[in-house]
UniProtKB/Swiss-Prot annotation:
It catalyses: (4R,5S)-dethiobiotin + (sulfur carrier)-SH + 2 reduced [2Fe-2S]-[ferredoxin] + 2 S-adenosyl-L-methionine = (sulfur carrier)-H + biotin + 2 5'-deoxyadenosine + 2 L-methionine + 2 oxidized [2Fe-2S]-[ferredoxin]. It is an enzyme of class 2 (transferase). NCBIfam families: bioB. Its EC number is 2.8.1.6. The gene is bioB. The lineage of its organism: Bacteria, Pseudomonadati, Pseudomonadota, Alphaproteobacteria, Rickettsiales. This is Biotin synthase.
Length: 325
């Protein structure tokens, strides 16, 4: 059973001497995962822009003028083409995101078709669609969804400073609905929004208090987007970022810890420290929803230099096969 952490013990770990913290995190990582493997996940926006939420970091919010063009839901065949490309590139997980407060009516039916078709490729499936009821989560599970992503973003105390169109408790309720439906949870946060290290630690503690803690934890570095309220925020301290990666690894020993948004601005050295600290998953590909991602060729070179191997798919399928609908 996963440990329920208290703030004081998590804070004590965070403030360990840096090398001691990384040593502990790497030890935990090696006890629970193949220590030279990295999971490659790919992310596709299947409905872009026009979101009614006012998340201060997000270029897809209808509240801000970021120059982003609103686009309708993608055709299923286009999504399937992207998923096949993901298999060819060596990804083992394919994530779809939609700029909604939550899916409605036929939108959920379309997403369910996407998921069932992607699943036939042998990929793990993940979706990020906003707030979700238990009944909607059950439908996604029946379609073959493995993971549901719903980041809590930051601590409960800091949450209202970055989002006011929904409550922190709404996020938790969706995560509980997802878990109750039998889906695995993917949930993490964003660093660099003006929050303190205390907020970052509390975010991880909150995740440990869920009925079913996340099996996948994305840690994002803020990408300041012109036109959003956080456009001028200062970058997070790199060593503090590594400390949070290490803390996530120790607190959630059996969960994937993913380097997510913001990796395109990280040096090879910073990413290497994150891998030492226990990160074992990255978003791969040129784009993350609407933002630039690290260049795939640069990723290949870094993984080769570090001797890191791609995690192998357990259920890979020949993409030349006609998978039907």
């Amino acid at each position: 059973m996963a440990k329920v952490w208290q703030f004081s013990e998590a804070e004590e770990l965070f403030h360990l001497p840096f090398l001691d913290l990384l040593y502990s995190a790497q030890h935990v990582h090696r006890e629970n995962f193949p220590h030279n493997e990295v999971q490659l996940a790919m992310l596709l926006s299947v409905k872009t822009g026009g979101c009614p939420e006012n998340c201060s970091y997000c270029p897809q919010s209808a509240h801000y003028d970021t120059g982003l063009r609103k686009e309708p839901v993608m055709h299923v065949e286009k999504v399937l083409e992207a998923a096949k490309r993901a298999v060819e590139l060596g990804a083992t997980r394919f994530c779809i995101g939609a700029a909604w407060r939550g899916p409605r009516g036929k939108d959920l039916d379309i997403v369910c078709e996407m998921i069932s078709r992607i699943k036939k490729l042998g990929l793990e499936t993940c979706a990020s669609l906003g707030l979700l009821s238990y009944e909607q989560a059950v439908s996604l599970k029946a379609a073959g969804l493995d993971f549901y992503n719903h980041n809590i973003d930051t601590s409960q105390e800091y949450y209202s400073k970055i989002i006011t169109t929904r409550r922190f408790s709404d996020r938790i309720e969706t995560l509980e609905n997802v878990a109750k439906a039998g889906l695995k949870i993917c949930s993490g946060g964003i660093l660099g929004m003006g929050e303190s290290n205390e907020d970052r630690i509390k975010m991880l503690v909150e995740l440990s208090h869920l009925s079913f803690p996340p099996e996948s934890i994305p840690i994002n570095k803020l990408i300041p987007i012109p036109g959003t309220p956080l456009a001028e925020k200062n970058a997070v301290d790199p060593l503090d970022f590594v400390r949070i990666i290490a803390l996530a690894r120790i607190m959630f020993p059996k969960s994937y810890v993913r380097l997510s948004a913001g990796r395109e601005s990280m040096s090879d050295e910073l990413q290497t420290l994150c891998f030492i600290a226990g990160a074992n998953s990255i978003f791969y590909g040129e784009k993350l929803l609407t933002s630039a991602n690290s260049d795939p060729e640069s990723d290949e070179k870094l993984l080769l230099k570090l001797g890191l191997l791609r995690e192998k798919s357990k259920t890979a399928v020949d993409c030349s096969i006609n998978l039907g609908s």
